[in-house]
Design a protein with these regions (language model features):
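Glycine-biased low-complexity/repetitive sequence motifs
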Residues: 1-188
């Protein structure tokens, strides 16, 4: 899709826009001890006092636009793994030059590190690394319980015991749409 700007002010500060770009989350690994999928990458920009809402702790400066069309891509989520298969990687979301990476896939096969991405996938071995937070690692012995997927603000937890996987990491809360809403949490 596109975001079309058809007219702008002569004052550059008045052409500021807030944005939030959240990528697709990843699928969790298959089997009973698969790792959780990582959250899609989360990017938010705001310009005060033009857009005075309560932003997430990850907020940066918003964008200034000109009269043109800006490309927008909304990333899809990854499919869950079946049996012992890995989950699918999330797809990137893009607004203009701002890209949020898709979430890192949760692993199903024992001993395999979680996928890298916007937030790392939970591992059936080590947790995945990320643009945001990392995924948790599996419990190694005597059996493997997968790690949780990373969230926008908190990493996924490691597997807790042979039968309890790690919790997914917390997302980020923003009121960009007028209501405090948490987004981009990791899978457990």
């Amino acid at each position: 899709g596109t975001f079309a700007v058809t007219g702008v002010s002569n004052t550059s500060a008045n052409n500021a826009v807030a944005y939030m770009v959240v990528a697709g989350g990843a699928g969790g690994g298959g089997a009973s001890r698969g790792g959780g999928g990582g959250a899609g990458g989360f990017r938010e920009g705001r310009n005060n006092p033009i857009t005075p809402y309560t932003a997430s702790p990850l907020v940066t400066t918003g964008s200034t636009v000109t009269a043109q069309s800006y490309p927008i891509t909304v990333g899809a989520g990854g499919a869950n793994g079946t049996n012992a298969a890995d989950g699918g990687q999330g797809s990137a979301s893009i607004f203009s030059s701002i890209t949020s990476a898709g979430g890192g896939q949760g692993r199903g096969n024992p001993g395999v590190a979680g996928g890298s991405g916007g937030s790392g996938g939970g591992g059936a071995g080590e947790g995945g690394t990320a643009q945001g937070t990392n995924g948790g690692a599996a419990r190694v012995a005597p059996n493997q319980a997968g790690g949780g997927g990373g969230g926008a603000t908190v990493a996924g937890q490691d597997g807790q015991n042979p039968y309890t996987g790690g919790a997914g990491g917390a997302g980020a809360t923003s009121s960009i749409n007028g209501t405090p809403t948490a987004r981009a949490g990791g899978g457990g």
